[in-house]
Amino acid sequence: MVERSLSYLDNIKLDSLKGFGEKRYSNLKKSNLSSITDLIRFYPRKHIDRSKIKTINQIDQSDIEKEVTMIGTISNVSVFTTKSRLRITTLSIKDSTGLVKAKWFGPQYIESRFKEGEDVALSGKPEIKKTGSIEFKNPTIEKFADIDELSETGSLIPIYPKVDGVSSGVIRKAIKDALSIIETPKEEFEPGIEDMLSSEVVDRNSIFSRTESFKSIHFPKTIEEFQKARERLALDEFIYLRSIFENLKSEFKNKNKGPKYIFENSLIDTFVADLPFQLTESQTKAYKEILEDLKNDYPMKRLLQGDVGSGKTVVAAISIYAVINSGYQVALMAPTEVLAEQHLNSLNEFLKNSDVEINFLTSSVKDRSEVMNNISDGKPGLYIGTHALIQDKVFFSNLGLVIIDEQQRFGVDQRKKLISDSEITPDQLVMTATPIPRTTALSIYGDLEISSINELPPGRKPIISHLYSGLKKDNEKVFEKCSKHLDADSQIFVVCPYIEESESSDIQAAEKVFLEYSKKFTDYKVVLLHGKMSYEEKENIMRSMQEGSIDILVSTVVIEVGIDIPNASLMIIESAERFGLNQLHQLRGRVGRGEKQSECIFHITNKKSLSTISEEGVKRLEAISTLSDGFKLSEIDLEIRGEGKVTGKNQSGRSDLKIADLRFDYGLLIQSKEIYDDINSLNSSNRVFEEAKLLFPNYFQADGTT
């Protein structure tokens, strides 16, 4: 007899369970819950500890600022809309010892989900009024079909994410039924869930078995038991990811043949020695890692990440030189013409003493016939461009290396087109100035090798950062800083988050700031750049800024990552609390690229101070104003926002981790590698991969390939 596998349980649909009619089953399917496997992997978002539930008369001053849970019955539901159209819903909830009021602000439609006479669990921070009455604001509320249900669930009651039309109580009962099925012997099955880890691995690592984990994640007897279950299930997710990425790499290597290069190390050494500056240790390490990859029979897939101004382009130049000297073409694709031109200028400088021919192809280049002929004829050289490089009429016949700058700015299909035009799969180098936390890198770029440049070139002056409030005295300081930099013939960036002010926000709009600076600095050229302008207008303004004909550029967030204006020495970020930490760091990096001492001002919204913004906003501003290391800031960003928002579907193109948390589980991530190596040595990796395909379908094509 064997235990039931997750694949077997995935074939048992929820409409076969008692109490699941067509409507309820339909609601569950909308939340991607259709099988027993889906259901047992629908993890609680929290547990209510029955031992810590308070009656109303037990809530006192010592509970203020703590989360308190109480059980009661709804005695009244009311909705009130203020003159400013703010919707306030109030529930009166009573138990045998008293009554509390719970209020929700905004369109949460609490009144449509909760009725008088229903039993509920309420969790939140209580406020005790001068009259002695107790009030909760925006608390968590859960419905229980019957108070008696609580006596059957043990000390810790699981509370599940919201599913429209299905209560937490119904989900609890369904999961109990599912676990009961799993625990019941039947024909060829013994109790339990088949474990991808052997009992030896489980024992050696002192972790829960899979069956124990699924039982205890939902219905733990203690918090410690819940933690052990969570750790095992999080570990499994990391093992699945590792399996997927190892198979991605293996599949890519087996299916694709890379270019064959012939280059002498002495040739590269001479090129590096002739550079006008000495490379940092991490630059040297990065280019050597790339050259080692280029020697392999299979194509390279490598991410080159480095902080703002760390010198990624010169590392790319060394790779370009090696590939072109072996008789191949190199394509470098940038997201905008301004950035493409900047790469053209930088690489012209780095490669000026070589015989490398550099070609430029963008939509605005008028005579493109010669470049197009060079591409189709397979003429070795560097081809720098934008989306024009992947147009239908562009056919590379001898492409050895593809370099993609700021990969997240291109769609998956666009990136693939540049690579798939060749019979031999070109090597791929992706460059990004957005440092990725080591814990997040696995889930975003797990199928790429990673090179990191984590130090700045020597002699570069650090940018001085200031955090100013929006109060009058600090506003004057901002203008004083502007005058100082303008007197030194420097240029200034002023960045705002939005074009227009809305009725619901007092945020400074770009037009308003533009008028303010225009009136204040009448002897200087102040220009406005915003997202509603055409592509050509934005490109022309950025060129004018590069040429030095603009003194102050007031802009919404359309300043390109990587834009290089050495004469810009002051960055002012208005309403800085409205920006993400990574955005703030990238914007700061637009200055400090020349010899002048540069400064960055993080300016809080007008009339506001640190005490008036959110706790998360304060953490961001304190971090950015005291730290300059992009890698450290990326780790802090992960801690503040959480993995879901950092990796997100939009960034990674995948929805992945259900229970693992990259902020806190780095130890499990490391452990997953050790365990996966054990699995490989036992030739069990195929089984793990099959489970990964079942549980992480977004990583796979319709035919099951990665």
What are these regions (language model features)?
Residues 232-383, 389, 517:
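ASCE P-loop NTPase motor cores of helicases and related translocases
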Residues 364-383, 391-399, 535-551:
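Conserved motor-coupling elements within RecA-like helicase/translocase cores
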Residues 80-89, 94-274:
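Upstream accessory/linker segments immediately N-terminal to the RecA-like ATPase cores of bacterial MutS
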Residues 358-370, 386-392, 499, 527-538, ...:
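Conserved helicase motor
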Residues 447-511:
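Conserved interdomain linker/interface between the two RecA-like ATPase lobes of SF2 helicase motors
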Residues 9-32:
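Helix-hairpin-helix
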